[in-house]
């Protein structure tokens, strides 16, 4: 399995480590050599393997009190390095952060691949590299660029298992400093292993290029918990940028990964348009209509990819984000030259112009509606009377169509009136109620269903009802004159009427108006009229002192052509010859209105 080479570019400089760090590194290497070369406590039994050709490699150890010379640059936000300690040991030793020089492993026998020999070889490499580093000159500018690589031949699975436990300790990336835009890249020694069927592993080492840099541009010493690094990266653009701008760029750089982390989106959130800079809808619509197709093409989002950062495509939209109600906008479509999106372009282009067309259609509909409403307000028609079912005119609908066909210049708009039955609203019962003054067939059926389900209940509680003790003595029994429809106990009526949440005194008044038996029970007609009065009070009508006979008659029959006429207090028609006693035109007109209203309400 081949791993791709990872390139790190940037201005780097080499800084010499202090003597304390070198001494600590030597101590850590000696402890590692003792623990892994002699796991059973035999200090002198292990020998240094001869088949390893080891060159010098520096050893670096982390210490909180010493200054940090360089920070590793994280490849992505979600890519974190976990730091773990070896099981059974309380002390943690850091992995060297500088790339080791070429190390050749020659697998000849099983004894050379033992854990003790591998650990001894690695510790010897640390010590040799530390000694070579201490003998080097301290001049920073005199060092040439170095290219370090690491290659590993195949190893046995038993040796790889122990080596993986040793190299699990990873150094987490330090916290990013917003005030300093310069970053440093720390090459890390990574042991990448993959066990295939043939137990072969091949990996390409990390290639890290270093450039000379003067000591004046180096970072100031800072305390760090991570390991010391031998390279530091300087950025000349950091000193020229504004701190607030750097803060915004660092906070709103959106790393939205798609396709397994190969695409990174940047530059969407910082481009939100404030409300103060937004224009009104009319100039925007006018601009949409008058602009040329070339300008429309320029407004498309410019999406391009950049493959320079760790081999990942960075998608920069460079488009001001407007929070619309839909995502299917034409200017957010994908360009033809873009190859970063593997999606189907037909689905995107098919809905690209739907919103612009819908805006035009909405404005046209508004114009039509406004003109239609003006025409309706200016006309005085009697369509309700002509099109009603109780109209005296023969074929009213045919007459209406005939008028529209033979008068093309007429401004009357023919509209179809569909009478839809609205659902009864318990919170607003007056909307589905008509004040007729009598009980309709629908209301009577609803009241009769409650009557049938609750009659003959608890009648034994009545004092005049024959008791169980007197049932044995047939001589003392008296025949009861009960109505054919049955009776209902007043306690049951009280329980039903209390559900209306009307005041108690009002319910008592209704019961006294409909109680005709005066024995603690109600018959069918009294119960239905009482229920109707309760509903009338719920509809908002006031309770009258006396009930009209028409209400009692509507319980057992159908009311046709009734007229709501107020009862006259005195007889005005006793003398027809007297012109003063004749009804006035106003009263006649009011009676005609009442007749028309009742004809519309009652269906013949």
Curated annotation (Swiss-Prot):
It comes from the Eukaryota. Residues 186-203, 224-240 have a biased composition (Low complexity). Residues 469-559 form the EH domain. Residues 276-290, 366-379, 396-421 have a biased composition (Basic residues). InterPro entries: EF-hand-dom_pair, EH_dom. GO terms for biological process: lipid metabolic process. The keyword Lipid metabolism applies. The keyword Protein biosynthesis does not apply. Residues 176-185 have a biased composition (Polar residues). Keywords: Lipid metabolism. Interacts with INP51. Belongs to the IRS4 family. With IRS4, acts as a positive regulator of INP51 activity and phosphatidylinositol 4,5-bisphosphate turnover. Negatively regulates signaling through the cell integrity pathway, including the MAP kinase SLT2. This is Protein TAX4. The lineage of its organism: Eukaryota, Fungi, Dikarya, Ascomycota, Saccharomycotina.
